[in-house]
From Swiss-Prot:
The chain crosses the membrane at residues 37-57. One of its GO terms (cellular component) is membrane. This is Glycosyltransferase-like protein gnt12. One of its GO terms (molecular function) is glucuronosyltransferase activity. It is a single-pass type II membrane protein.
Length: 550
C-alpha cells in the first residue's frame, strides 16, 4: 500500500483556500463595479419620486383653486372684511383667498372684496411685448375672452368676479379648451361677498333710482351690483406692460391691431421720430357696433300728417279741459279721415339689416368697414342713437377721410365732457386709476353684454380725470373696435334710462330720479378729480356739471 505524502494534502487545502479567497475577491470587485450603476438607479428613482410629488401638489392646488387662508390680515384694521367662504359654507375654511381690498369712500361701493392676482398665469412669457389689453370678464361671457385672444396674440390681463365654485370651474374649463387663452391671458379673481347685494351706502338713500324699486321683493333680487371699476383696477395694476389698451369684453379689435399699435408708439413717441410733442399722451381707438337685426320683414306705413303740437295744449286753461279734450278728438278724427281719403300715407321699408353678422364676417380692412357701414348697413358708430356726444369728439368724418392716405398719422382732438372712448395709454403716468365707487347693475341670470346696463360713467369719469390731469388725445386712423351685440332685435336706443341719464348729465337739469352713478360722479368724483389735479372744483373745465347743478 502506498501513501501520498502529507505535504500534498496541505497543498490541496491551501489550494482550496486560495480558490475561496479568489471567489470572494472577484465578488467584491464585481460589487465595486456595480455600485455606480446602483447609485444612478437610486438617483433616477428619487428624481422621479420628487417630480411625482410636485405634480401631485400642483394638481391638488388646481383642484382647490389655489385658495388659501388669510394669515396676515389685521382684523381690527379691516372691520368690514368678510371672511366667510365664497360658497357660504362655514365649515370649509380653505375657500378664503389670501388678499383683500376694502372700499372706504363716502358714497358708492363701501364693502370689502377679497382678490387673488394671477389666479392663473399665462404660459407665454411677456418678453418682447410692449402693450397689454386690460379687461374684465362677466362669467356669463367667458367665451368672448377667447375671441379677443385669438386676434390680439399678446398679453391680456383679465379680472373675473367669482361668486361660487362653478365660476372658477368655468374659468379653468376655458383655459383648458383655448390655446390662445392659456398662452396669453392672466386671470385675476375678485371674490363676491355673501352680502354684496346691499353695497350702496345706506346713509345716502336719496341716490337710489326709484325706477328700479318694485313692491315685489323677488323682482328686486333679480339684479346684482357689479364692481366694474374694481375689476378694471385689478387688471390694470397687474398688467405686465406699462402701455395698456382698456376694452370691454364684448368688443373685438381689428386683425393686426397689435402690430399697428406697437408701430404707432415707435413712430409717434421715439425721440428720433417724435411726431407728438406731449408727455401725457393717450390714443383713442374708434368704436363701432353691429346694427341691430330686425325680425320684421313687412314694410312700415308712415303718415305725412303731423301730430297736434303740444304747445297748443299748454294754452288751454283748467276750466276748458273738457272742451280741449273734445277738440283734440275732433282733430285726430279729421286727420285720420283726410289721410285716408287723399292717400297721403307713404310706405317705407324698415332700414335694418336682416343678416346676422358673426365674428368671422367682421371687416378686416378699413375699406371693408366702410362698406359695412355705408352700403350694407351692418355696422354703425357706437352709441349713435343713445349718446351722440359720447363719441362725437372722435370726428368719424375725418377718420374715414384718411382711408386713402398711406400710413396716416394720429390726429389730435379736443376733449369735451361726456367723451367715452376706449384708450391706449401708459399706466405709469396716471395719477388716478378708475374710481371704484362706480358700479354696474346686472340681471342675476344675465347673458347680456357688459354694455347693456344703464350705468355708463365708469369710463366717462376716468377720461375726465385724464383730461383734467393734462392728457392729450389722439385718434388712431387704422385701428378700430366692433361691439358684438347680443340682442338680435335691439334698436340700440331702447335704453330709456340711458337717454334720461345722459340728458341729466348733459343738460344739468334738476331731475328727482337720479341714477346712482350720476349722483356719485356729479357730487364726488368730478370735484375730487379737480382737486387732485390742482383745479378749482367750483369752476368748469370742460362744460361738466358742477355740484350745485346736480
Amino acid at each position: 500500500m502506498s501513501y501520498l505524502p502529507l505535504y500534498n494534502n496541505n497543498n490541496n487545502i491551501n489550494n482550496n483556500n486560495n480558490n475561496n479567497n479568489n471567489r470572494i475577491n472577484n465578488n467584491k470587485e464585481k460589487g465595486v463595479k456595480n455600485k455606480p450603476f446602483q447609485i444612478f438607479i437610486s438617483i433616477v428613482f428619487i428624481v422621479f419620486l420628487c417630480f411625482f410629488l410636485i405634480w401631485s401638489m400642483e394638481a391638488k392646488k388646481d383642484k382647490n383653486i389655489k385658495i388659501n387662508k388669510i394669515s396676515n390680515i389685521d382684523q381690527k384694521n379691516s372691520p368690514n372684511l368678510i371672511n366667510e367662504p365664497i360658497n357660504n359654507n362655514k365649515n370649509n375654511k380653505n375657500n378664503i383667498p389670501k388678499n383683500h381690498k376694502q372700499f372706504k369712500n363716502k358714497k358708492g361701493l363701501i364693502k370689502s372684496f377679497q382678490y387673488e392676482p394671477f389666479a392663473y398665469k399665462a404660459l407665454r412669457n411677456e418678453d418682447g411685448f410692449e402693450i397689454s389689453i386690460v379687461t374684465h370678464v362677466p362669467i356669463e361671457n367667458m367665451e368672448k375672452i377667447a375671441m379677443i385672444a385669438d386676434i390680439w396674440r399678446a398679453p391680456i390681463s383679465a379680472s373675473v368676479l367669482i361668486k361660487n365654485k362653478n365660476d372658477i370651474d368655468s374659468v379653468y374649463k376655458l383655459i383648458r379648451n383655448s390655446l390662445s387663452v392659456s398662452e396669453f391671458v392672466d386671470f385675476h379673481f375678485l371674490y363676491w361677498n355673501e352680502d354684496s347685494d346691499s353695497i350702496i351706502n345706506n346713509n345716502n338713500n336719496n341716490i337710489i333710482n326709484k325706477n328700479k324699486i318694485n313692491t315685489n321683493e323677488e323682482d328686486n333680487l333679480n339684479y346684482y351690483y357689479y364692481p366694474i371699476n374694481s375689476l378694471r383696477n385689478l387688471s390694470l395694476k397687474n398688467s405686465k406692460t406699462d402701455w395698456i389698451l382698456t376694452i370691454d369684453i364684448d368688443y373685438l379689435p381689428n386683425y393686426g391691431i397689435y402690430q399697428y399699435l406697437e408701430r404707432t408708439l415707435y413712430t409717434s413717441l421715439q425721440p428720433s421720430k417724435k411726431l407728438i410733442n406731449s408727455d401725457l399722451v393717450s390714443f383713442v381707438v374708434p368704436s363701432f357696433q353691429l346694427t341691430s337685426i330686425s325680425t320684421k320683414t313687412a314694410p312700415t306705413t308712415i303718415s305725412t300728417q303731423s301730430p297736434t303740437p303740444i304747445s297748443t295744449l299748454k294754452k288751454t286753461t283748467l276750466e276748458n279741459k273738457n272742451k280741449t279734450i273734445s277738440t283734440m278728438s275732433t282733430t285726430m278724427s279729421t286727420t285720420t279721415t283726410t289721410s285716408a281719403t287723399t292717400n297721403t300715407k307713404i310706405t317705407t321699408k324698415i332700414n335694418k339689416p336682416l343678416k346676422k353678422v358673426n365674428r368671422y364676417d367682421l371687416p378686416e380692412t378699413k375699406f371693408q368697414l366702410q362698406t359695412f357701414i355705408y352700403d350694407d348697413k351692418l355696422i354703425e358708430i357706437l352709441n349713435k342713437k343713445s349718446c351722440l356726444k359720447c363719441q362725437s369728439p372722435t370726428n368719424y368724418n375725418k377718420w374715414f377721410s384718411l382711408i386713402d392716405t398711406t400710413n396716416p398719422s394720429p390726429y389730435k382732438i379736443e376733449y369735451s365732457w361726456m367723451y367715452d372712448p376706449y384708450l391706449l395709454y401708459n399706466k405709469s403716468q396716471l395719477l388716478e386709476f378708475y374710481d371704484e365707487r362706480i358700479f354696474k347693475e346686472y340681471p342675476s341670470s344675465s347673458t347680456l353684454s357688459s354694455s347693456t346696463t344703464t350705468n355708463d360713467y365708469d369710463k366717462i369719469s376716468f377720461t375726465f380725470s385724464m383730461a383734467s390731469q393734462g392728457f392729450q388725445f389722439f385718434i388712431l386712423p387704422d385701428a378700430w373696435l366692433v361691439k358684438m351685440n347680443d340682442n338680435e332685435d335691439n334698436d340700440n336706443d331702447n335704453d330709456g334710462n340711458n337717454n334720461l341719464i345722459f340728458n341729466n348729465l348733459n343738460n344739468n337739469n334738476n331731475n328727482n330720479e337720479y341714477n346712482e352713478n350720476f349722483y356719485i360722479v356729479c357730487n364726488s368724483i368730478l370735484p375730487d378729480s379737480k382737486i387732485k389735479n390742482n383745479h378749482n372744483p367750483h369752476k368748469k373745465l370742460f362744460n361738466e356739471p358742477l355740484t350745485n347743478e346736480c
